[in-house]
Every structure is written in structure tokens, then in C-alpha cells.
Amino acid sequence: LLLYALSEDPFFSKKDILLIEKESKNTNDRTWSFCEKKEGAFEELLEKKWDVATFLSSSVSLDFKLAPYQYKMLRSKGFYKACREKIESQKNIQYLSAEKTALKTEGNASKVITTEGTFSSKNVFNSVFDPTALYNQKKYPVLKQHFIGWFIKTKSEQFDPNKILFMDFNIEQKKETRFLYVLPLDSKNALVEYTLFSANLLEKKEYEEGIISYLKNQRITEYEIEEKEQGNIPMSSFPFDQFNTPSLLNIGTAGGWTKASTGFTFMNTSRNVSKVVSFLKTGKPLNHFNIKNRFWFYDLLFLDVLSKYNSQGSKLFE
């Protein structure tokens, strides 16, 4: 996202930019879903968007309109392709396939040490998440948004393509916060995810049994699994920005840009990228960049309650 934003701004057209990735990405290895007002930068790449959402629990059954927002799905394959085309079209952007082995700040520059050599810059942006510090502390509560999702195709029409099932808590909670999440692409195709906000991961079998059980309860028995995906996203208000330096800025999940109360990352990152682009034009040291606001504190409080009363998650979201 940051590379794309920099490439769109003429201010950076004469700046040398190097993108280092462990391997080139060209598949649907992830799906981003997010709320957004009006048309966004990736509107043409969207898989689908919706205007209505459903929330279900033992005591609540609610359809609600999202206006002035829309809920949008962006799949990674199209996004990666757009980024590759952007890199290839601009001479000031170079791509390197290499594995990062270390990051070091020395003087007024940071060094990226890779399997293909060492690179130094006064502005280094790191999106590789290192969980060590997060899980070695006790001050800030830590949960995970973890899930397995199936893209399925049913034999008959089963889904309302005009609305998403945002959260369905009408499944066995097992003393945790568990729900189903369904994004219908049309009346026969949908992404169905079994999701938890909890401290510990499950065996793969348990997520998939949860999906099978849910579909059976919805009387959906004839379907094909076309794709699978899984994820594990940290949820915490831990201050990752303490690891930034004058020449190094951690971004995305590595920078604490995931919304702590939900595990959503894409729109938070998109907003922060816009702020970074403006910030770079000031010439200030990167560790002066700050994203904290009152919502950071609200998320901290919410997550503290959710971690202590994880079995009551559905009541909190009601």
C-alpha cells in the first residue's frame, strides 16, 4: 500500500525506491475486507461490495444499512498484479527478491541486511512482523483474530448477494468468542469463515468442522470447496512504535496498525499510509510519526474487557 501511494504522488517521482520481498506474490493468498466511504483507490480491483450487513446472536437479529459506507472485498491476486505493473512502469522503483536477515540503525541511516546484500537508506519501511516483544510482555492484553475460510460454490441458490453476514454468534462458543462470517459473491458463491477472537489457536480440523456444522445447520449440503484461506492476526494495543528510529518506520501489523478491537488491518493501514506520505514531505525523523488517538485508548479498554471475559464476546459486540 505504501509503495502504491508513493508511486501515485509526483513528489516522489525522482526518489529512488527499492522494494524487497522474500518472494514475488501473484496468487490469492489473502482476502482484505473493509468499510469505506465513496470510491477508493482500488475500486476497479474489488471482487464485490455490499450495502447491508447482518448481525446475529442468541438475543439479537439485526439487518443494518451501512450507508454512507460500503463493505468491500479485495483479493490479493489483482492487487499484486496492479502493484507489479506500477513498479514496471516507473524507472525510479526497483524490485528485489531476497530474504531479510536483519535490520540495523547506524547513525542517520538504517541498513537492511538480506541474502542478496546490504542496503542502506535514511528512510526504511519494514512490514515484516516480529511477534517476540509482543508475546514477551504482560502489560498489554493480546488476543488473536484467527480463522479458516472456504470459498464455496453451492448447487442451488443459497445466499443473498446483497448483504453480508458480519457476525453470527449462534454457534457453540466453548468459553471463547467464536462466530461465522459470510461474504456472498452471488447467490451460489460465498466466502464462509469460522473465526475466533481468543488467545489460543485451534487445530485445523476444528475450524473446518465448525464450517461444516454451520453449513449443515443452514441446510447447505451440496457444495464444492473452490479455495481455502487461513489467517492469524494479533489484536493488541502494544506500542510497536517504540521500535521506530529516525530512519526506520515499522508499518502494517509490524507497526501496530491493526485495529486492536477487531483485527482489521487494511483500512487502518490505508489511512496511515496517507499520513506517512504527507509526513515524508516534512523531512522529519521517522520516529516522530505518530498514529495514536482516542480510538487507540478505546481499543485498549475494549480489548482488556474482551480478554478477561472472552466467553462473553457476543454480549460485548451486541
List the predicted regions and their residue ranges.
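N-terminal FAD cofactor-binding segment of flavoenzymes
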Residues: A5-S59
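C-terminal helical "tail/cap" subdomain of flavin- and related membrane-associated enzymes
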Residues: S274-E318
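FAD/FMN-dependent oxidoreductases across multiple families
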Residues: K100, K174, S198-K275
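Short, flexible loop/turn motifs enriched in small residues
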Residues: E47-W50, K175-T177, F243-N244
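Predominantly flavin-linked oxidoreductase catalytic cores and closely associated redox partners
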Residues: A5, D9, S89-Y223, P239
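A conserved beta-strand/loop capping segment in the N-terminal third of enzymes
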Residues: E36-A98, L103-N108
